[in-house]
Amino acid sequence: MALASTAVNTDVTPPVQTFDLIMVGGGLVTCSSLSRQNCVPGSQFTADAKQTSVYRLTHSALERAFKHPSLSGLTAPQKTILLHASQQQGDAGSSLSYQAFYDAISAVEKDFLTDLNDQVYYALLDLLEDEQAITSGINRQEHVMLSATQNQYGAQIFSLFTQQALFKKQQRQPQAKRPLIAVVTASARDPFESIDFYTQVFEQAGADVIWLPLDSALQAAIAQQQCDQLPALREKIQGNVDRARLYPVATALQQSMCVSPDSLYQQLLNIDGLFLNGGDQRLTLSAWLTPQKKPSKALDIIKKRLQQHQIVIGGTSAGTAVMTAQYMVTGGTSHGALTYGVLAAEAPSERCEESHCQSDIPATAVTYSTAGGLGFFPFGVTDTHFSQRERQVRLFMLSALSENKLGFGVDENTALLVDLRNHTVSVVGEHGVWVVEQSHVTQTPLSYSGVMHYLTAGDNAKVDVVTQSLNHIQLLSADKTINKQADVKREFNAWVDKACVDGQNDIDLGQAKLIIKPQSQQECDQIKRNGQHYQNINIQLNLVNH
């Protein structure tokens, strides 16, 4: 299945640099009909483009939803609240944005939606989402205009991935002009929602594109020979319901591939690039593992092709986090790491920070899986949305617990390129990649220490797998600086700047004391010359009352 785009750039030139992985930190800014704020002024989409998700808060829509087994837990008073909200909306209730939908229900009962558990909350949204039909069987789709994106870093990363996929293909077919890229959207609770986005992005970047309907539900259905139970498995494992109503073609394709999984395996043997979307890395992982947590046949195929350098694998956000062979972070914040520690436990629902959910694990506590991820990236722990969400402390503390003591935190709209054959890494994109190495922890008193680097576009290094550190670090000319837009929280970098000026910077974090100390002033020269990248700066975190 490929959803075609009319604007396709066929001028794809293989790059000089070769790599096997492109690990994106999330936040790839792209112009689309759902993200018009990312488009150059004057960009126009056709009338059939999907502009937002729409919900029906009407009596008939609610009565239909109440009949679905997933809402059997709703009480009579809860149903009355929803029906009353629909009456208040009148005709307007037939087409509501999510915010209008939320406000309409909250006007009747303030905490109604936040008090619902995940299963009921998401089922309610899915059952009331409108198809936005254009004609019978054809619904509105998100439209992408890659070339109309104001901030071109994301478009360049998509194009770079496409170029590398073509390079891989030309090793087998020298005259090839277009690579075949497969998109797997298993990270999302609703894996059908972003199909249009990713297929159009890579088509416009110059590739032939297929969507592979591989997700946790499909993996379970194949393993258990329960293809007739796919909708129920989607609800149980992924947490989505009623998807065939909105995505009839995609759900039919998934059903067909479940019955004939050899077609999935053949496509995995044919593709030149594989891209994993963002969302929840636990969902991505379970899409590639059997219900017994063993590598699936699909994963075995991809790993073998990766080892033979026949394919390039990319991912964004969760798609990057899941690539690690080390501990896989699953949730939490730096503040949560300082307050509650780093826990080998199941992460609570992402709604816990804003809703009244019950969980033994605090909403902000850092959680991780000791089993690791898919194992594509062997060099360390991975983290994403890095500087934007100030995740330095959480990655530092988790890396100290991992086997190889290396951590890589990738900023948004930025990517880490990984050459597995030569053990080299390099950075492209708008911001940078924070690396912590030689990290370790002492228990009495509780203290973490390590060495950190911050690499930006054009910087590269070699990973020494014996010493578990970076060497041969090459920083691009200090004339270039990274983007300092307001959306990036630069407090940590400001602390490093001060350490470079004063020789050391002690920061009181409340629950801990952070000490940043350059190994020599030479390590700060790049910062002093108006750069933002740096290398070989010692970092120590002393926790109080632990």
Regions found by a protein language model. Give the residues of each.
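A structured beta-alpha segment of the ubiquitous adenosine-cofactor-binding alpha/beta core
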Residues: 220-222, 235-267
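Catalytic nucleophile loop
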Residues: 275-278, 301-302, 306-327
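Low-complexity, highly charged intrinsically disordered N-terminal segments
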Residues: 183, 196-199, 207-210, 247, ...
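C-terminal and late-domain segments of enzyme folds
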Residues: 5-179, 184, 189-197, 202-206, ...
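Catalytic-core regions built around general acid/base machinery
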Residues: 263, 267, 294-309
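Short connector loops at secondary-structure junctions
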Residues: 187-190, 207-231
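A Trp-anchored, charged/polar loop motif used as the substrate-binding/catalytic surface
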Residues: 249-263, 297-300, 357-364
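Short acidic, glycine-rich surface-loop motifs adjacent to enzyme active sites
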Residues: 268-289
